[in-house]
UniProtKB/Swiss-Prot annotation:
Organism name: Macrovipera lebetina transmediterranea
Source species taxonomy: Eukaryota, Metazoa, Chordata, Craniata, Vertebrata
Enzyme class: hydrolase
Protein name, per record: Acidic phospholipase A2 MVL-PLA2
Superkingdom of origin organism: Eukaryota
Subcellular location: Secreted
Amino acid sequence: MRTLWIVAVCLMGVEGHLTQFGDMINKKTGTFGLLSYVYYGCYCGLGGKGKPQDATDRCCFVHDCCYGTVNGCDPKLSTYSYSFQNGDIVCGDDDPCLRAVCECDRVAAICFGENMNTYDKKYMLYSLFDCMEESEKC
């Protein structure tokens, strides 16, 4: 419980994009957004290595790969525009980089929603020391 409180305090100062991504996750999963995924498995959260532990972790692997294709802005810091229309996430930027970041986040949020049945609490706050297998290529 103490660790969850520390993560919550750390996220309180987060502005822009990460709160937007968390909002998308919340809408698609009904969970606490980023808090549910911040240190999940080998790929959710900062960094990422090894083999994705389940379909939920694979969503994060694909998200990391998507961020790797974004050029012209920092995916983790850029603020984009989006809306929810009839339950769908709609990215609304004209700027190609901001639209690409939004699309990466949109696809990941949908993936989390579609794979909620694979979410396993044993992968919450997962140690990267358990992620020593050779990493897959994007």
